[in-house]
A protein has these predicted regions:
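Bacterial N-terminal signal peptides that target proteins for export
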Residues: 1-11
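N-terminal hydrophobic or amphipathic helices and topogenic motifs
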Residues: 22-103, 287-340
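Periplasmic-binding protein-like
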Residues: 66-67, 141-150, 237-275, 282-305
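A local structural motif
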Residues: 86-97, 189-204, 239-242, 324-329
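Short helices/loops that flank or line small-molecule/ion binding pockets
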Residues: 102-116, 129, 163, 207-227
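Bilobed "Venus flytrap"/periplasmic-binding protein-like clamshell domains
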Residues: 63-86, 121, 141-212, 219-220, ...
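Bacterial N-terminal signal peptides
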Residues: 9-19
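Ligand-binding "clamshell"
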Residues: 126-138, 232-246
Length: 340
């Protein structure tokens, strides 16, 4: 029911996307893939800050995190961060619960949401259609939190390069999996290996089953998420000496954090200061797998691999792609309702 409310509430966004909002974007010299509401004159792929006279300086800032099964958990988890944000900006900060990715995009586009954490994929929709400016990812002192796509082969196998897998049997996880299927189909052709053409694809069902299948000799190789593989090694489920990694992709980021480009520049600077001066509570460190801070990123550089995968799989971050996401959310909500 909650998911359906989120879906129905977002239908208004479809109409909103067709409405041109007059303003500074009319003077735009470069827009790129951004909606006509926004401008990208500096060509960093995100919306430029709204100029004085057109920017927003709300008395209360609205924050939310990517939709999850139990929103109350994250509302409590981010309460200390919200208090820090209030101290730095001098403004009240409230948590706004959203029940779908599409509703979250619409909330920022409509001006009801000012600061947010968006999931990896929906970040692209938020940037292009809602004027979202991602600036951080959960991380530590050295790097942002993320994972890589890796190709595993058995240690005693003859396969040393990706080209060696031509004509072999390779386990993908499932058709809808990003790192287990979509990413390999997008990234492997540049390595001279086209799934289904250069090797036979079989679906294992899960990342751990792909890993174990390689170890047991059921598959010649398997593309899997590095974080899943690392957890299996730490848990003793697989011996790292039993396999070899012959390919590692660029790092995939986790959820992004950022703000609306429609906020006044001075306020945006204070929001950035609040993000980067904050250190996670013990509860946050535990919940976010050891991350202890917001690590700075840029959408242009750090989301490049995500955009490449989206383009290669036809999931472009535009209105058509958004409609597809809405349809998928509706389908998932209906399936969930039938199970209850």
């Amino acid at each position: 029911m909650i998911m359906m409310k989120g879906f129905l509430g977002f239908l208004a966004a479809v109409l909103l996307l067709a409405v041109a909002v007059p303003g500074y974007a009319d003077e735009c010299t470069n827009r790129g893939l951004l909606d006509t509401m926004y401008c990208d004159n500096d060509q960093d792929l995100v919306a430029d800050n709204a100029p004085a006279g057109n920017c927003k300086d709300p008395s209360t800032l609205v924050f939310t995190y990517t939709p999850v099964e139990d929103p109350a958990v994250y509302q409590d988890l981010f309460s200390d961060f919200q208090a820090h944000m209030k101290k730095v900006t001098g403004k009240d900060v409230i948590y706004y619960t959203v029940h779908s990715n599409s509703a979250q995009v619409e909330a920022m586009r409509s001006g009801r949401l000012h600061i947010a954490g968006f999931s990896t994929g929906p970040t692209g929709f938020a940037v292009n259609l809602a004027g979202y400016v991602p600036i951080a990812v959960k991380g530590d002192e050295k790097e942002f939190q993320g994972y890589n796509l890796i190709m595993l082969v058995k240690q005693d196998s003859p396969y040393q390069t990706m080209a060696d897998l031509k004509g072999k049997k390779v386990a993908h996880t499932s058709p809808s999996s990003n790192s287990g299927n979509l990413a390999p189909r997008a990234l492997f052709p540049s390595q001279g290996l086209v799934p289904d053409e250069d090797y036979t694809v079989v679906y294992s069902g899960k990342h751990d089953q792909s890993v174990l299948g390689v170890v047991h000799g059921d598959y010649d190789a398997a593309p899997v998420a590095s974080d899943v593989y690392d957890r299996m090694v730490r848990a003793g489920r697989v011996d790292a000496n039993a396999v070899r990694i012959i390919y590692t992709s660029p790092r995939f980021p986790t959820s992004s954090f950022g703000y609306s480009s429609q906020l006044c520049p001075d306020l945006a600077e204070k929001i950035k200061e609040a993000f980067f001066s904050y250190r996670y509570t013990e509860e946050m460190v535990k919940a976010f797998d050891g991350a202890d801070r917001f690590f700075p990123i840029t959408y242009k550089d750090d989301w490049a691999v995500i955009r490449e995968i989206a383009d290669a799989t036809g999931a472009s971050y535009n209105e058509e792609g958004l409609k597809a996401m809405i349809a998928k959310e509706k389908e998932d909500a209906e399936k969930k309702a039938k199970q209850q």
